[in-house]
Regions:
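Terminal, low-structured helical/coil segments at or just beyond the last alpha-helical repeat
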Residues: 49, 56, 60, 159-198
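Alpha-helical adaptor scaffolds
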Residues: 63-135
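Alpha-solenoid helical repeat scaffolds
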Residues: 35, 52-55, 70, 90, 101-105, 124, 135-139, 155, ...
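N-terminal leader/linker segments that initiate helical-solenoid repeat arrays
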Residues: 20-71
Length: 198
């Protein structure tokens, strides 16, 4: 299923090729620029480069201790040491609670462990801090679809598409899930944070 593979790659955040650097003060400006370019890009190679650059910005960590925890958690996920990666990302969240990608990485580890409630909580924390996180929205959509919450899955995938219109197969997946029916809930994402989904 190409769409699920695409979402999984997004959810994992290109961990295999990630290059964690010290965060610059211009990170937010850089992300704004990258997202603007992603909206208008048409060349597949440019799209892939922009997506990778966005992920790299998300995983940038400002100091050595936090960077070491991020790298260790990513390495543990790559080695399928998922419980250890949860512990590592929990430590990172404790010392850097505003770091959206720490929440997203822990959400991914929880998802891989099959702990959907914990993953959902961390995804909601991710999008509270980074409302453009198309990887988190893709993961949220996959979990909601798996749980049979089709309208919430649609809402999540639509937000993923809003911030990254190049996700392969997302239009077909949204159409498929809309055909499954269901009433749209008051809280479409199920996150309850007012800032989520901007």
């Amino acid at each position: 299923m190409p769409f699920v593979r695409t979402c999984l790659a997004a959810l994992l955040g290109l961990m295999l090729g990630a290059n964690v650097l010290a965060q610059s003060s211009g990170s937010t400006t850089m992300l704004d620029t990258l997202f603007a370019k992603l909206q208008t890009a048409t060349d597949p190679v440019a799209v892939q480069s922009l997506e990778a650059a966005i992920w790299e910005q998300w995983i940038m960590v400002p100091d050595g201790e936090k960077r070491a925890l991020m790298m260790r958690g990513i390495a543990e996920m790559q080695q399928r040491q998922l419980k250890e990666s949860v512990d590592t990302f929990s430590k990172l969240i404790e010392i850097a609670p505003d770091l959206s990608e720490a929440w997203n990485k822990r959400a991914t580890a929880y998802w891989l462990l099959g702990n959907f409630p914990a993953s959902l909580n961390d995804i909601c924390e991710t999008v509270k801090r980074e409302p453009r996180h198309f990887g988190a929205y893709s993961g949220l959509g996959m979990i909601r679809a798996e749980m049979g919450e089709y309208p919430r899955a649609v809402a999540a995938f639509e937000l993923a598409r809003k911030h990254n219109p190049h996700i392969i197969g997302i239009d077909d997946e949204i159409d498929r899930l809309k055909a499954m029916g269901g009433d749209k809930p008051d809280d479409p994402l199920g996150c309850s944070q007012r800032t989520a989904g901007r």
